[in-house]
Amino acid sequence: FDPGTMTIGRSYVFHYPYVTTPCFLIDLGSPAEPGEDLVTSEGETYRWSGGVGPNRSIVAFSAICAHKMSYPTRSVSFIDYRHKPMSGDGTGSNWWDRGQVIYCCSEGSVYDPRDGARVMSGPAPQPLAAVSLEFVAEEQALMATGIYGGAMLEQFLEKFGFQVALAHKIDDVWRPASGTTGVWPLDEYSRTGVC
């Protein structure tokens, strides 16, 4: 995927590590540095590797909310990235007037994509799982190379496997994503954005 085609602040969806598991791809517009250690709901510690790309501003996370596993579908998305503040003066004293957050309006979980999708507010018990990206400068290409943190992939496919099999018109919901996968702007992927 050519990151030069991305619009800063717009959320994109791709499927990884399986053809049925959605992830966000976001260009934050400025470098996203690695942060402090993060902890999964199982107590495992990991360190987010930060942004990639020409400006180190491109990040990717699982688009499956860590609370009740809301995720973007073709018909609706209850989870999305908000680049601009929802209200307020943008000073960041509250998450809703800071902007640059991933917000799940199903139950109100808020994640900070500049800090490894750390939970800022709401009931989510852990950050969104991080997707390892590699930027190949010679080809101007992004590649997903792994997923880490509290991925919740087994729980997701056990709970929603039948639904995603129908939506993707496939029999094997565990089929690995390989080669070139589709990348869609979320507002084109989902017909209705709720948040």
Where are these regions (language model features)?
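Short linker/helix segments within small regulatory modules
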Residues: 90-99, 123-125
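A conserved acidic, glycine/proline-rich C-terminal tail/linker
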Residues: 118-120
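Extracellular/periplasmic metallocenter environments
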Residues: 67, 102-116
